[in-house]
Structures are given as C-alpha cells and as structure tokens.
Amino acid sequence: MAPPPPSAANVSQPVIDSLSAPPPADTVTQPLAVVSEKLPWRHTFISLKVPNFRIFAIGHFIAVIAIWMQRIAQDWMVLQLSGSVTAVGITVALQFMPSLFLGPWGGMIADRFAKRKILIICQSAAAVLAALLAVLSLSQRVEVWHVYVIALALGFVTVLDQPARQVFVNELVGPKYLRNAISVNSTTFQLGGLIGPALAGVLLTALGAGWAFAANAVACCSTVAMLLILRKDQLHLSQPTPRKKGMLREGLNYALSKPTIYWPWLMAGFVAVFAMSLPVLLAAFADHVYDAGAGGYGLLNAMVALGALAGAVASTRRRQLRLRSVVTSAGLYGLMLCVSSLMPTMVWFSVTMVLAGFWCLMFLTAANQMVQTSSNMSIRGRVMSLYLVVLIGGQAIGGPMMGWLAEHLGPHLAVLISGGVPAIAAVVVAVVLARKSSLHIKVDLRDRRRVLRIVQEPQTV
C-alpha cells in the first residue's frame, strides 16, 4: 500500500529562482513536494513495489558484488605486481580521469538519447573489458600497464554509464518515489560492497585475481539481460532534449544559479579529492601497518561497506532533505577519518571504518538526492554529469595524491589529512550558510530530547 499523499501542512516547497527576465521553460524547476513526516517502517523500501525498479535493483545488486570483487582484486594485484601504493593510486586515477574531462558530454548524451540503450551498450563494453583482464590474469601474462590500459578504457565507459544510470532511476519509478529509489540504490550498492570484498578476499587467497574479473564479466552480461526484459510501457520516459548550441553552458549556468546544487557540489569536491580514495589508504594500512595481507584488505573494505549499508538504510528514513544534512554528514565523515588515524590496533581501526562508511553514505545520498530533485528532467543529465565530474574527477586527483602521501608521510598522517580537510571545509560552509540564513544554535536544557536546536533569528522590520 502506497503512503498517503502529503498534506499542505507538512510539505515545504523549494524556492524558485526569481530573475528579472523569465528563463526558458525547460530550465525552470517546478515546485517539488518534500514530505516532512516520518514514513512507516513498512514503506522504508517502497520504491521496490515498482516491478521495473525491482528488476533493475536485483541486477544492480549482482553487478555491484562483482564490481567490488574486481576493484579489490585489481588494486591488490597492482600492489603485488608493482610493490607501490602510488601505482594503485594511478590505477584509480586512470579509471576516473575520463569523467573529469569528458563527463559533461556524457551528461549531454544522456539528455539526448534513450538511457536504457546507453546502459546496455556500456554494460556490454564493461563485460568485454572484464573478460580481457580475466584472460590476462588467468594466463599469468598480466602486467601493470595492461591494468592501466583497461582501467582507462573502463573510465571512458563510465563517462556514458554514470549520468545515464543516475537519470534512469527517475524513468523507472517516477518523481513520486525518486528519493526512496536513490536510497534503495545506495543500499544495494553497499550491501554488494559488503559481500564483494569478502568474496574477493576468499578468491584472492584461494584462486587468484583472475576469477574475480571473470565473475564481473558474467555479472555485466546479467545486467544487460535484465535491462532487456524491463517493460517499456511502465517506464516514465522523458522527451529527449533536442540538440542546440550552448547545452553544456546552459547546464552549468542552471546549476550555479541554485544553492541546492552548487553547495552539494562544493562539499562533494572536498570529499572526493581527499576522502574518497579509501581503498588506496586501506591497502597501505593492510600491507604496511597491520601486515594483514589480502584477507585483511578485504576485511577493512567490508567494514566500510557495513557502515555504508547502515547509512544507506538510515537515509531512507530521513524526514527532510536540507543543505545542513549534506554539510553535517560530510563533516562527520571527515571527523571519523581523523579519529581512525589515532586508533592503535586493527580492531579499533575497523570500528572507526564502520562509522566512516555510515557518514560517507549519509553524505552521498543526501547530496545526490538534493541535486536530482533540484533539477528538471530536461536538463538533469547535464546537471548530474557535472556533479559526477566533481565526484569522480576528484577521486582521479585524490587517488595518486593520497597514495603519495601514504608512501612519503605514512598511512596514519595520510588518513588524518584525508579526513581533516573535508571536516574543516564543512565547518566553513556551515558558518557561511548560517550567516546567510541568520541561523544560530539554541540551547534548551528543559527539552531533554532536543537540547541543541538550530533556529532562525527573527527578522527586524
């Protein structure tokens, strides 16, 4: 049973930009209802009631398990072949670098063509690349440069895949269940991230990296099959945007005119560059600090995924989506990374990784939801591609940088910097937003449930 429609008493409407001249109709964001009441627990994953989205989520879950297996196996194989954490960072950078330079064009293509067809082509290409890496590894002919080339090729696939995948969720469920579907997608991603590293650790120890790559090739094929069986008549298809001059500039101007888009972009930039290269740092901790081997590396990644899974589920229960949610989550993620740098043993380090994973996902889902619900379908592909340029491109910069810091300054100081910069940025942004909105913290010792509250100062006439 679907949740009741929100009443006027508990729905807030975003502010629509007021300009001296009316903007084009396709770039005006219509008011989007934001439900402020807490939904019953039975509606936590209500978007799965949509048959097409349920099929997509199952395929996504299988694919995520396999891609996590490939990521762990790929990073560990590069570390073993080269003996260098920096080489692992370069691999990450090559996989993300195309999105940094070509991401906006990927978003423009997502706005102009059918998202489902784009995803089918991209997943087919990913299957071929994974199969090639599996053959090289199983034949024991793989070299570091092979991994570099395949990682770069996969990066070009990601340029088209990611913006189309982000916008396709809306075509599966429609605007009614969009926020919930984004959270469910994050939940399946993190659940797969919990299972994938654990399976990767077993495969690396028992059979070798090649079988992890082979599993990902099969999973990509299964994703293609599930995309093909989706019912077209149940898709919420949007009209393709006709080609015209200045489409990329239009998307950028649109995003920069909306605080609910550009502030999440800014925080995503700090988090992506400094705090999204955890696999690089975890490889350094597993190999150089705790001497835990491939199994320990998989375990640390699984701990992050466990916390992220909890964060993804918690994000489905979020009553309201505000800028303060985005900034606070980013700040707490950075703080948890700082705390982890002080942990004396692998057990305590693993505990802080669970907390870091939780707040990382609370931030990522909040930022994603806010950017998507603040933009119209006709321009959303370009807006999301620019957001992904910041998020993925930041990782391309941060991967080698954090690898270099871990090698030359040590893993502990590297993870302290990794968390410290986003935490400081969150504090600065919070102060700026508070001043713009005349907000301050109120202490009320009589209210045990809400001792601290953020309130707006009354405006003087």
Model-identified regions with their sequence ranges:
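Alpha-helical transmembrane-bundle signature of multi-pass membrane transport and export proteins
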Residues: 2-461
